[in-house]
Amino acid sequence: MKTRFLLESHRTPELNGEFNPSLPTCLDDAGHPYFGRILHHLNRLLGETDLSFVVTTSNVETLPEYGPGVISCILEDEQSKETFYRSKVGAIFRCYPTFPSHLDGVHGFKPIHRLGASYVVARDFLRGAPGRLRTLQAKVGRQKIAPIFEIPIGYHAHDTVDFIPFEMREWDAFFCGSISHLRKNSPDEILAKFRPKSLERLQMKAAIEQTLEEHPEVRIDRSYTASFNESIASSQQSYLEKMMNSRFSLAPRGGVPHTYRFFEALRYGTIPIGETFPKSVEGAPFVRLRQWDDLSETLSHLLEDRARLKELHENALTWWETQEAEEVVARRMFSQLCEMGMAVEKTEVISAKQVA
């Protein structure tokens, strides 16, 4: 009896098939370093089982195998589609919610911008409709439906950098990333300026310049890329060194409110500051702006409050270590599987000689 792990990725099809999570780096080449380390810890907790974990990027229609012992792990479905196979597997772990979250945080947008965001939600909801109908049919037929558990998206950049004490960091705030990820001549290009990601990041960019003009003493390291793919193709070492060397991470939303940047910041005790954050991280130590226009005043005031800065920094490190660290998430997944009867807590057997 052996726990099996399979990769089913449209990004790296050459790596698809069974893989061994005995090494923490098992999914690095597939672009999933965080989840690979989670599976590394989970595998050690599970021991030998008859479970099969299928790791997929965003395929919600088919899996290479089905059964009550199959666990689907969906890592990149930002469109929050329902799976076609919820009645065919034992459990589903996914990195994004089950309903499109594009409208989160659009309270400050103009009506025309709300319309653009609403279009994206409606589009993605319709894309997920076939799966939702299949699940509804299964429920009507009283078939067993797999539970869904949301897990953090974690980090993408994972190179090792030296820790810099908070008071010794050179930059007050840092941002490196794209403003919009749409390709030229794509069907959605005309809607780019109405989409939540582009809108919020343009507002952030303007707020950065406003902050530097009003408070020239504030040091902000910023650079912009043409797309998300260009961002992840750039030097991870340089990106993480700058993140580590900053007190705040400017954290605008992406295509959805969830971003790698948020977790990469917490991991280093860098304080995320922004306007839109997913509901799943409520309670985490971040600074929420009412709108990006408030950045200048908020940042300058916080930088003067050294005690508050230290508290936020320490809380960020603690939150990562107790809520989002790879081993913590693995233990949470293991507990959920145990509650479902799909895994069993190991008990230590003590011999009479050991007791004596």
Per-range role (PLM):
Residues M1-Y260, G274-K279, G283-A284, E327, ...:
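Nucleotide-sugar donor-binding catalytic core of glycosyltransferases
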Residues M244-S246, A265-T270:
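Conserved donor-binding/catalytic loop of nucleotide-activated donor transferases
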Residues F248, E264, H301-E304, T318:
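Short basic/hydrophobic patches in alpha-helices and adjacent helix-turn junctions
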Residues F277-P278, G283, V287, W292-L295, ...:
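Catalytic cores of eukaryotic secretory-pathway lumenal/extracellular enzymes that build
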Residues Q291-R308:
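C-terminal "capping" alpha-helix adjacent to the active site of nucleotide-linked donor transferases
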Residues L303-E345:
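A charged, aromatic-enriched C-terminal amphipathic alpha-helix characteristic of glycosyltransferases
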Residues V349-I350, Q354-A356:
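Extended, composition-driven regions rather than compact fold-specific motifs
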